[in-house]
């Protein structure tokens, strides 16, 4: 069988080249739940973090035992890979109904706390028909937060994360094409929630962006704005002594910022929970004129404090 002969330098380059994408672990939501519960200790937003720990726990329960639902279309997936398009394109799949059974399963799994606002939000989501649910979901993934009730965001967002992560873990990404300056998730097209700076092995010192929807990680060079791609005068803002290992990469060109989790500073850190535990940093950045560009689907807009 014919093959390609690699020269010595090419062999070393191929062996040392880091992976373009990293899949989330299958216990992702359990890890998030445990981390949120830990961060809630002595935290001013303890009740909120514990609520979201329960949200993530229900996500893991359904991910471990997913309901019967329509499988991914292999022909469409192949075409997406062929044309370098996201195989789990959020703006398309969210308008279809394959994710709705996972929403229902999550609603059944979630242990609703004794909180009137949470009870009302979950009940509103439970009673909504499929058309209304899809309309809200389209608004959420497209960033049109004024088009859905803010109280629904963490719960609808949890179901969408669950569905897309479930699908992502079924994919073989070997045919996914690497592209430079990829500011949106190569698997689903959603924006990143945060960046994570690795600190071990082959990935030491590399930055990966973490998808806000499916939790795929993809390589993106450091010292470059993940929104406008500028490399000019980026600033890194953080609170001294913060145990979460979070710094915000702030860009004066677009006035946006993205939080970065440095695992060297917080080896047990996890990006979603670290983001939610450092909302005081968001307030500081807002006071300095920076705008948050990265969505966190468990965070209702306007409820950063």
Swiss-Prot record:
One of its GO terms (biological process) is protein maturation. Keywords: Cytoplasm. Gene3D superfamilies: FdhE-like domain. One of its GO terms (cellular component) is cytosol. One of its GO terms (molecular function) is ferric iron binding. It is found in: Cytoplasm. The keyword DNA-binding does not apply. Necessary for formate dehydrogenase activity. Belongs to the FdhE family. This is Protein FdhE homolog. It comes from Stutzerimonas stutzeri (strain A1501) (Pseudomonas stutzeri). The gene is fdhE.
């Amino acid at each position: 069988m014919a093959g390609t002969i690699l020269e010595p330098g090419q062999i070393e380059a191929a062996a040392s080249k880091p992976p373009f994408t990293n899949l989330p672990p299958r216990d992702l939501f359990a890890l998030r739940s445990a981390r949120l519960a830990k961060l809630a200790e002595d935290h001013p937003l303890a009740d909120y973090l514990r609520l979201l720990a329960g949200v993530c726990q229900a996500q893991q329960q359904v991910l471990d035992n997913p309901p019967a639902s329509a499988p991914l279309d292999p022909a469409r997936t192949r075409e997406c890979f062929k044309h370098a398009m996201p195989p789990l394109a959020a703006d398309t799949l969210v308008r279809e109904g394959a994710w709705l059974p996972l929403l229902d399963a999550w609603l059944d799994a979630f242990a609703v706390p004794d909180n009137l606002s949470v009870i009302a939000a979950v009940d509103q989501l439970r009673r909504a028909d499929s058309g209304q649910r899809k309309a809200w979901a389209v608004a959420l993934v497209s960033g049109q937060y004024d088009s859905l009730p803010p109280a629904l965001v963490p719960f609808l967002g949890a179901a969408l994360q669950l569905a897309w992560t479930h699908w992502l873990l079924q994919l073989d990404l070997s045919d996914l094409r690497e592209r430079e300056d990829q500011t949106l998730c190569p698997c689903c097209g959603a924006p990143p929630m945060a960046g994570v700076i690795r600190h071990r092995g082959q990935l030491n010192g590399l930055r990966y962006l973490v998808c806000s929807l499916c939790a795929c990680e993809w390589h993106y060079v450091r010292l470059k704005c993940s929104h406008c791609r500028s490399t000019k005068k980026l600033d890194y803002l953080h609170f001294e002594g913060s145990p979460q290992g979070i710094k915000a990469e702030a860009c004066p060109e677009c006035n946006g910022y993205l939080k970065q989790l440095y695992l060297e500073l917080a080896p047990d850190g996890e990006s979603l929970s670290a983001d939610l535990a450092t909302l005081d940093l968001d307030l500081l950045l807002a006071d300095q004129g920076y705008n948050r560009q990265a969505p966190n689907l468990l965070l209702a807009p306007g409820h950063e404090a």
